[in-house]
Amino acid sequence: MTPNLQIELRRFISSNVVSKLNKFYFENDALLIKGIDVSIGTILMGLYNKAEESDFYSEIVSMIQEDSTFYQEIDFNAGRILSVDDCYRLEGNALLKELFSNKKGRISEMVSNEVGIKSETAREILNFSALLVMSYLRYNLQLIESLKLLLEDQKRDILNSIPPGIKIILGFSCYETVEDKSQSMGRSIFTLFGHNFFSF
């Protein structure tokens, strides 16, 4: 069965994870969730943009070591992050540099502005999201060969989760969405994450 990457990744963002992250950032829970969702979509479209670079997917995923702190804190079978500490602040930064190079700072600021969270929070949840996405792909290495096609197939849905300013930085039109704008705006953040947000 072909996985929906966003749905699979959102499974890991439980209320417990949000609560632990907010010990560092003191943001509104709903805005923090939205920021993570935007960041995950941004990382996925960053990968989409690298599809034509030979071996890029294999190389960036190989940067995730199985003995790394963040990787070991994920129970992939259960779809749970077991513990949240600040290791991602350092571990995720190198991934973002590979993915976005000189656009990294602009994307971080745009996440902050578009979502309504502090600049520091935006920087660090981008690190967190980069590690989550790459760790998921590291665990599911069989997806690497078909990742380009997966991202192409899911491109419009992913773009729906990304605000216009970030789309422009990534090189996409603001109108590259699959839903009518009013329908998309009316979607509840909590619905995006399903029941898992309320599970511990």
Outline where the language-model segments fall.
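A structural "flexibility-hinge" signal
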Residues: 1-200
